């Protein structure tokens, strides 16, 4: 059984859940990140116990690998089981959001209470687009394997999806992510390429648990995606693609509002 490295956060002592094993918040980070990225938001959601997971090739899971989305979903299920988590809300950002959607749609997700996705791509609708993305991701992976990591990261954060970042913010991210291992990042990037990901929208629309889509108001690509596919969208002010980093207070408030609202919904109202 493969289990991912993770960190547990207990609820605040004054929380009514402190003495009870209620639903957990399980957090999945993006490419180049770690579970620690979620710490500010998780602490602000301190009425709930949290599990901050390091995905394969990242953080304390750097020595672990994954053979695609189904394998990562299995690792996630095994990690939850090993930590005694029976009921949980699953939240994911970017790559973590894509993994979260896949797990909710196709994985062993007994006990899943709901889904929170930040800037996660639903996939590509045709083979031509998937093949082009595979080629693009292979080129990035080759750079992560062969070139100095700060040099690759500097170019990585010049991509259009990070257009809201100013030079100082880009420099901070390059420094923050420079402790990654290029070979491990390359392997994970290829294993989870959008070219390998199934088109998730139809399965997402059939979910029988509530879900929401969170997006920074400056993240034009994913705002358009959410609007195009009529996802249940909540926007975060003064934030781009990484909204939980830019505005953790507003992000946590949206999470708590969604959990509160969803916990009161009758089964017939779920997901909408």
UniProtKB/Swiss-Prot annotation:
What UniProt keywords are attached to this protein's entry? Answer: Lyase, Menaquinone biosynthesis
Instruction: Return the EC number.
Output: 4.2.99.20
Q: Keyword Nucleus: yes or no?
A: no
Q: What pathway does this protein act in?
A: Quinol/quinone metabolism; 1,4-dihydroxy-2-naphthoate biosynthesis; 1,4-dihydroxy-2-naphthoate from chorismate: step 3/7; Quinol/quinone metabolism; menaquinone biosynthesis
What general EC class does the enzyme of this chain belong to? lyase
Q: Which Pfam families match?
A: Abhydrolase_6 (PF12697)
The biological processes this protein is annotated with in GO are: menaquinone biosynthetic process
- Which terms does the record give in the GO molecular function aspect? 2-succinyl-6-hydroxy-2,4-cyclohexadiene-1-carboxylate synthase activity
| Reaction equations catalysed | 5-enolpyruvoyl-6-hydroxy-2-succinyl-cyclohex-3-ene-1-carboxylate = (1R,6R)-6-hydroxy-2-succinyl-cyclohexa-2,4-diene-1-carboxylate + pyruvate
InterPro entries of this UniProt entry?
AB_hydrolase_1, AB_hydrolase_fold, SHCHC_synthase_MenH
**What's the domain of life for this entry?**
Bacteria
**Member of which family?**
Belongs to the AB hydrolase superfamily. MenH family.
> HAMAP family annotated for this entry?
MenH
Q: What does this protein do?
A: Catalyzes a proton abstraction reaction that results in 2,5-elimination of pyruvate from 2-succinyl-5-enolpyruvyl-6-hydroxy-3-cyclohexene-1-carboxylate (SEPHCHC) and the formation of 2-succinyl-6-hydroxy-2,4-cyclohexadiene-1-carboxylate (SHCHC).
Whom does it interact with, and what assembly results? Monomer.
* Name the UniProt record assigns to this protein: 2-succinyl-6-hydroxy-2,4-cyclohexadiene-1-carboxylate synthase
What is the species of this protein? Answer: Yersinia pestis bv. Antiqua (strain Nepal516)
